[in-house]
A protein has these predicted regions:
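Core catalytic alpha/beta fold that binds nucleotide/phospho-ligands
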Residues: 1-123
Length: 123
């Protein structure tokens, strides 16, 4: 049974502008070290950064928590070995156990101007 579905779309230019203004401070706020290393190694850095940002927003929406109650950007990590998937930790891991989560699926898509992230949580 589906517990939650979240979707988010972002302007790649907007994310690029935020990065140009705040630099590494922005990256450290929203990405884990592994995600940062992955994005920085890509030729299409802004595209990959925007995709990860969008899917993390989608995960937060699917859990219905927002960034509150102890949930942080670092409670989820987009893992890029094979098809992208999300690893949970901290408060989101606790919430997932509490709701009896059986599966979490994500998808990331991007094109020239936008990136979109989708998350479905099954219980």
């Amino acid at each position: 049974m589906i517990y939650g579905c979240g979707i988010d779309i972002v302007s790649i230019k907007r994310i690029e502008d935020i990065y140009e203004k705040h630099g590494e401070r922005f990256l450290r706020r929203v990405l884990t070290d592994l995600e940062m290393d992955y994005c920085m190694a890509q030729k299409a850095f802004p595209l990959n950064l925007a995709g990860r940002f969008a899917v993390k927003e989608a995960v937060i929406k699917a859990f219905k928590t927002g960034l509150s109650g102890g949930v942080t950007w670092h409670d989820m990590e987009v893992v890029s070995s094979g098809p992208p998937h999300v690893a949970l930790s901290g408060r989101l891991q606790e919430i997932s156990a509490g709701i009896g989560m059986k599966a979490i699926s994500i998808s990331i898509a991007h094109e020239k101007e936008h990136a979109v992230g989708l998350c479905i949580i099954e219980v």
